[in-house]
Swiss-Prot record:
Residues 237-239 are annotated as: LVD motif. It comes from Rotavirus A (isolate RVA/Pig/Australia/TFR-41/1987/G5P9[7]). Ca(2+) 1 binds at D95, G206, S214, E216. The keyword Calcium applies. N-glycosylated. It comes from the Viruses. This is Outer capsid glycoprotein VP7. One of its GO terms (molecular function) is metal ion binding.
Length: 326
């Protein structure tokens, strides 16, 4: 009997020793993992910077108030500035060093020469097909043309606002716009857009779904089209898809790092007629048209006032980014 009790006690003691050894081994292993992880974090922390998304715009509610979401403070002078101008400006100036001259003048306003970029574009139509706004602050000069008021207004609406867009398959599906912020945006070398509104039985209202010639033409051979139809009504669309792409888009709010300067014209183009566009005339401005040198001198003089009406953003805009998330 005593032998059995001794064996039980011995087994119990051996188990305690084994468990104690096991716990110490686990503790050492965990300490090793934790210390190594902390060491890696400490080593990488100085070279890793959190992404700065600039401004948060709420998906619902008021779009007027931006909320700061900056993870680091940067000196104003470290920002980049892009100035977009029509190619005719460079042609009229006819000076190979005009950009260097403007860079030196902007330096007097506090903008280092390496932070300012000049980008020309052929015309409003071609610029609207592939807008590329990559700088922290982007100023777009558009020379007023009475024959291009609609194109100028649509381009301003596109680049002064953020859009969330998805592809449309018009061969398989009908589409409807859910509210005033919902638009169909088309881009391409030639966009002709026709629509046929449908009733609840999917029969055409004033048109035949099998005859595209009976569709209503809302745009003809344009490069940029922002289409607005009656909300809550299904539509069958006909689009020149070989030369144009169309996306179903939702206007999210203002793109605060872009300003449009209208060169010439009696009044600033009004893009606020759309109920979804908050008044933003402070970022849609006009300068008197004289000569391009005079225009650029005016921009240099007021560049800091213009930038103060904007907000620095980290998100760039190009045609691909526009289509899926701006």
């Amino acid at each position: 009997m005593y032998g059995i009790e001794y064996s039980t006690i011995l087994t119990f003691l051996i188990s305690l020793v084994f468990i104690n050894y096991l716990l110490k081994s686990v503790t050492r292993t965990m300490d090793f993992i934790i210390y190594r992880f902390l060491m890696i974090v400490v080593l990488l922390a100085p070279i890793i910077k959190a992404q700065n998304y600039g401004i948060n715009l709420p998906i619902t509610g008021s779009m007027d108030t931006p909320y700061t979401n900056s993870t680091m403070s940067e000196t104003f002078l470290t920002s980049t500035l892009c100035l977009y101008y029509p190619n005719e400006a460079a042609t009229e100036i006819a000076d190979t060093k005009w950009k260097e001259t403007l860079s030196q003048l902007l330096l007097t306003k506090g903008w280092p020469t390496g932070s300012v970029y000049f980008k020309g574009y052929a015309d409003i139509a071609s610029f609207s097909v592939e807008p590329q706004l990559y700088c922290d602050y982007n100023i777009v000069l558009m020379k007023y043309d009475a024959n291009l008021q609609l194109d100028m207004s649509e381009l301003a609406d596109l680049i002064l606002n953020e859009w969330l867009c998805n592809p449309m398959d018009i061969t398989l599906y009908y589409y409807q716009q859910t509210d005033e912020a919902n638009k169909w945006i088309s881009m391409g070398s030639s966009c002709t857009i026709k629509v046929c509104p449908l009733n609840t039985q999917t029969l055409g209202i004033g048109c035949s779904t099998t005859d595209t010639n009976s569709f209503e033409t809302v745009a003809n051979a344009e490069k940029l089209v922002i289409t607005d139809v009656v909300d809550g009504v299904n539509h069958k669309l006909d689009v020149t898809t070989n030369t144009c792409t169309i996306r179903n888009c939702k206007k999210l709010g203002p793109r605060e790092n872009v300003a449009v300067i209208q060169v010439g014209g009696s009044n600033v183009l009004d893009i606020t007629a759309d109920p979804t566009t908050a008044p933003q005339t402070e970022r849609m401005m006009r300068v008197n048209w004289k000569k391009w040198w005079q225009v650029f001198y005016t921009i240099v003089d007021y560049v800091n006032q213009i930038v103060q009406a904007m907000s620095k953003r980290s998100r760039s805009l190009n045609s691909a980014a526009f289509y899926y998330r701006v």
